[in-house]
């Protein structure tokens, strides 16, 4: 499956397996894959398109569960070395999602 994106004046298809995470800043969402793509859409729009390998974490981030290497109460480490802050209250739901997806 692929995510269809219109960014930088062109239409792109990004395979789900390439997407590590998505995060939001103001009114823009950045899709972090092999390259980063920033588009003016809501995180909720993406959440509807993505499948169960993705988990929304708080208001500002969606993670691809297969890239998660380690989770603590305050941060998530991805397999590429990226460390992301974990919002308060997100630890338990994220752990449940990881267990269900395994």
Labelled PLM ranges:
Residues 1-79, 83-85:
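Conserved binding/recognition cores within well-folded domains
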Residues 1-9, 90-102:
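Eukaryotic intrinsically disordered, low-complexity regulatory linkers and tails enriched in Ser/Thr/Pro
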């Amino acid at each position: 499956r692929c995510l269809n994106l219109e960014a930088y004046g062109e239409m792109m298809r990004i395979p789900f397996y390439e997407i590590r995470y998505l995060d939001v800043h103001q009114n823009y969402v950045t899709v972090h894959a092999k390259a980063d793509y920033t588009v003016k859409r809501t995180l909720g729009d993406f959440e509807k398109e993505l499948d169960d390998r993705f988990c929304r974490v708080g208001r500002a981030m969606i993670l691809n569960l297969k890239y998660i290497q380690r989770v603590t109460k305050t941060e998530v480490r991805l397999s590429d070395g990226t460390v992301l802050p974990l919002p308060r209250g997100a630890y338990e739901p994220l752990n449940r999602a990881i267990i269900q997806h395994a």
